[in-house]
From Swiss-Prot:
Primary role: Transcription factor that mediates regulation of both acid- and alkaline-expressed genes in response to ambient pH. At alkaline ambient pH, activates transcription of alkaline-expressed genes (including RIM101 itself) and represses transcription of acid-expressed genes.
Region (Disordered): 1-77, 96-122, 294-347, 474-527, 560-593
Listed name of the protein: pH-response transcription factor pacC/RIM101
Location(s), subcellular: Cytoplasm; Nucleus
Organism this protein belongs to: Candida dubliniensis (strain CD36 / ATCC MYA-646 / CBS 7987 / NCPF 3949 / NRRL Y-17841)
Regions of compositional bias (Polar residues) in chain numbering: 12-24, 61-77, 102-122, 337-347, 486-509
């Protein structure tokens, strides 16, 4: 009776199915197992559980339903289904033909549709190629078959062949195996190796010791020794490099396996200078020598005057000092522009202000050169401003006599009085500003008969200005008795007409016993009414009844309190030669420049204590300026009168010498 069917079919089984079960179990006579192995739960998952229910041992035990149900459950488990292909392959090797049920058993086999079909259907199919993930299950599960005594041992060689078949299949096609043909992701992510840089040739730098010799030829196998590098160089060029005309030209350098190859003979001979300590090109200005002429030409530029390396530190300091002096002179000139005294006025007053910002250097030089023409323009401007322009245009036609007389009469009425008042003061100030801004050139004019009237007018105006100036000065002294008179501080005139005051000449005698009164007056005038004083020597002098000697007669060994100890020359020379102390020297030069700026700022020709004096609306400084302006016009007019008188006297002499008088037509 067959119990390898569904449990419901087992209940309806009869004795007719017994023959079928016995026939099925005849093919498994080679495997013998104990009954306890069929009931074991661990063996239920093994492939041997498929055939254990059909073994003779189970049939001898009366076909227990427990064992039949256990084998049936093991046959339907998922693990058994996954291993079913391998088991069927093993059974096909032992069976000569496929199992075919008899005709009498067809109703029973049709009723059992699940288990027999799942067991017999893989027998008609060949092993198919599985995915590699499933193939790992078979490769990693050989332990189930090794524990079987005969059944597993017979299956083991076939199992290895079966495992080798997918591996050979993958190796042949190369789809899934990670072989050398397909790079991995790590290999793709790796950076390509850096290119190897070619070997750079380095050459030995020639030193002075290398130029002493002897010199050995290192060309290939040549070992000739020479005394001078010139002979070695000629040997290389003639014997080793050769010439094309001699059919021995070699353009490859073989000096210590150098291997440099050139195209022309000139190139290889120029390359040989790298190996030979030869410097035939010498500098005429220094002791340096060079291998190539272009190197010498490049070096010669460093000896140019405008090259930065040529300028030593002392020269750079000298240039800075010159620039600083020019800057300080400009500052001093600007300050002197506000220090114009009355003694500077006369005819040279309007020659231009040296420090005035309105004038450039060229125009200022031109005014100094053309001083006479500029003075002529000043005089003409003053005369025109005081309505004396008609006297420079004498009548040339007879019909114009009445017009000239009437215009002269009108001019006389238009002229202001010769008294110096506030109107004349404002007019001269306006004229002063106009002359400082505009300087057109005018031709000298010949004055007519009115030149005497002009001279008389400006003479009276000059006298009026002098009186006003003296009255204002005395009034200022009365208001400020402790202040010296403005006339003494600023001398009115100087007969020599110099732009700068002359220095005093100090004699060997004492100050009290002067040789002449004129010498003493000159000292007083040049030093604002007091005798000059000098810094005292910082040491005690022996007292004697005789008057002390002037400072010029003293020895020059003392140190004044106004002097400053100088630095030693050696320290300055050493610091100038040292180029590493440039920054410190720059700081020192900057501080010294600032000190010089402060000292120059303190210099001023004008006494700061002298304030602007204004009395009754008149500025005392402007009054002195106007006095010099009128005086310059008066001097010029007197020169013109003198010149005209000379011309008239010459004409009278010529008229006396003539035999016949001339007749003038009206």
């Amino acid at each position: 009776m067959n119990y390898n069917i569904h449990p419901v079919t087992y209940l309806n089984a009869d004795s007719s199915n017994t023959g079928t079960a016995e026939t099925t179990t005849q093919h498994h006579h080679g495997s013998k197992k104990s009954p306890s192995s069929d009931i074991d739960v661990d063996n239920a998952t093994s492939p041997s559980s498929f055939t254990s229910s059909q073994s003779p041992h189970i049939n001898a035990m009366g076909n227990s339903p427990h064992s039949s149900f256990t084998s049936q459950s093991a046959a339907n488990s998922p693990i058994t289904d996954a291993k079913q292909h391998l088991v069927k392959t093993t059974t096909n090797e032992h069976k000569p033909a496929a199992f075919t049920p008899s005709v009498g058993q067809q109703p029973a086999s049709q009723t059992n549709t699940t288990a027999p079909q799942s067991y017999t259907q893989p027998a008609q199919q060949l092993p198919t190629q599985l995915h590699p993930s499933l193939n790992q299950v078979y490769n990693n599960q050989p332990s189930y078959y090794l524990h079987q005594p005969a059944y597993g041992y017979q299956q083991q060689p076939l199992h290895q062949e079966y495992n080798q078949q997918p591996q050979q299949y993958h190796d042949h096609h190369g789809y899934y195996a990670n072989n050398n043909n397909i790079p991995s992701i790590n290999e793709l992510n790796q950076k390509p190796p850096a290119p190897v840089k070619p070997f750079k040739k380095t050459y030995k730098k020639i030193r002075d010791e290398d130029l002493k010799g002897p010199f050995k030829c290192l060309w290939s196998n040549c070992n000739i020794i020479f005394e001078t590098p010139e002979i070695l160089y000629d040997h290389l060029c003639d014997d080793h490099v050769g010439r094309k005309s001699s059919n021995n030209l070699s353009l490859t350098c073989l000096w210590e396996n150098c291997g440099t190859t050139t195209v022309k003979r000139d190139h290889i001979t120029s390359h040989l200078r790298v190996h030979v300590p030869l410097k035939p090109f010498h500098c005429d200005l220094c002791t340096k020598s060079f291998k190539r002429p272009q190197d010498l030409k490049k070096h010669s530029k460093t000896h140019a005057e405008d090259h930065p390396k040529k300028l030593k530190k002392a020269q750079r300091e000298l240039m800075k000092q010159q620039q600083k002096e020019a800057k300080q002179q400009q500052k001093l000139a600007n300050k002197r522009a506000n220090a114009t005294t009355a003694s500077d006025l006369q005819l040279n007053y309007y020659s231009g202000n040296p420090g005035d910002g309105l004038y450039d250097e060229a125009s200022r030089k031109r005014r100094y050169e053309n001083n006479s023409q500029h003075n002529m323009y000043v005089v003409n401007s003053i005369l025109n401003d005081f309505n004396f322009q008609q006297m420079a245009q004498p009548p040339q036609q007879p019909g114009a006599v009445s017009t000239a007389v009437s215009s002269e009469f009108t001019t006389k009425r238009m002229k202001s009085g010769s008294e110096y008042n506030i109107d004349v003061f404002n007019k001269l100030n306006h004229l002063d500003d106009h002359l400082h801004h505009h300087h057109p050139q005018q031709n000298p004019q010949q004055y007519g008969g009115n030149i005497y009237e002009a001279e008389k007018f400006f003479n009276s105006l000059s006298n009026s200005i002098d009186m006003q100036y003296q009255n204002m000065s005395s009034q200022y002294q009365q208001q400020n008795p402790g202040v010296a008179s403005f006339a003494q501080q600023k001398p009115a005139q100087q007969t020599n007409g110099q732009l700068y005051p002359s220095l005093p000449t100090i004699g060997n005698g004492s100050y009290t016993t002067s040789s002449s009164s004129s010498h003493k007056e000159g000292l007083v005038n040049n030093h604002n009414g007091y005798l000059p004083s000098y810094p005292q020597i910082n040491r005690s002098l022996p007292y004697s009844g005789v008057a002390q000697q002037p400072p010029s007669a003293l020895e020059f060994g003392g140190v004044s309190t106004y002097q400053k100890s100088a630095q030693s020359y050696e320290d300055s020379s050493e610091s100038s030669d040292d180029d590493d102390d440039d920054e410190d020297d720059d700081d020192y030069s900057t501080s010294s420049e600032e000190e010089l700026d402060a000292l120059f700022d303190k210099l001023n020709i004008v006494d700061k204590n002298v304030e602007e004096v204004t009395i009754d609306g008149f500025n005392l400084k402007d009054v002195a300026k106007h006095r010099d302006m009128i005086h310059s016009v008066l001097v010029y007019l007197r020169k013109q009168i003198e010149q005209q008188e000379k011309e008239k006297s010459q004409e009278q002499k010529d008229d006396v010498n003539q035999l016949y008088p001339t007749i003038t037509a009206f």
